[in-house]
Amino acid sequence: MKYWLMKCEPNAYSIDDLERDRSTSWEGVRNYQARNFMRDEMKKGDRVLFYASNADPSGVSGLAEISREAYADQFATKSGHKYHDPKATKEDPIWYMVDLGFIEKFPAVVSLETLKSAPGLEEMVVTRKGSRLSIQPVTRQEFEIVSRLGRAKPKR
């Protein structure tokens, strides 16, 4: 099993949306490295830290899992769609997506600030300056630490 961090802006799709829908397709990824992670490495059952970016605060808001392995992002071939890519064809889709299934919403967001200061997360990709990739690998230890932080009762 592998572990991932997947970023999404909450105004586009949030952990609340995933909790309501129970599953969703993760379409619209238009970065080759992120696409390669989805296409070549993500497997059904892999665990995901669901990260709310451009939020107040930005951070991990819950857990998900890969519920369907990579398949062609059909929106890439739909003319006029916001994710259309004129180079993509049904024979060579270029872009792929996976499906995510909901696991858990945390009582409070584990903020980026908390991630940066938590022991054991010093090497976590998301904490590095300039780390903008929307899909990032995380280690099992990082996943477990963030999950523990997320399940902790919020301090008042």
Residue ranges and their predicted role:
Residues 1-9, 69-71, 116-117, 121-156:
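Mixed-charge, low-complexity intrinsically disordered regions
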Residues 2, 22, 44-46, 60-62, ...:
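A generic structural signal for short beta-strands and their flanking turns/coil linkers
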Residues 62-133:
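Aromatic- and Lys/Arg-enriched surface recognition patch
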Residues 51-57:
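Short, charged beta-turn/beta-strand-edge "cap" motif at the junction between a beta-strand
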Residues 14-16, 57-60, 72-75:
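Short acidic/glycine-rich loop or secondary-structure boundary segments that cap or lie
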Residues 49-50, 65:
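Hydrophobic beta-strand signal
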Residues 1-44, 142-143, 152-156:
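Compositionally biased, charged N-terminal/linker segments
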Residues 17-18, 76, 111-113, 146-149:
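A short secondary-structure junction signal
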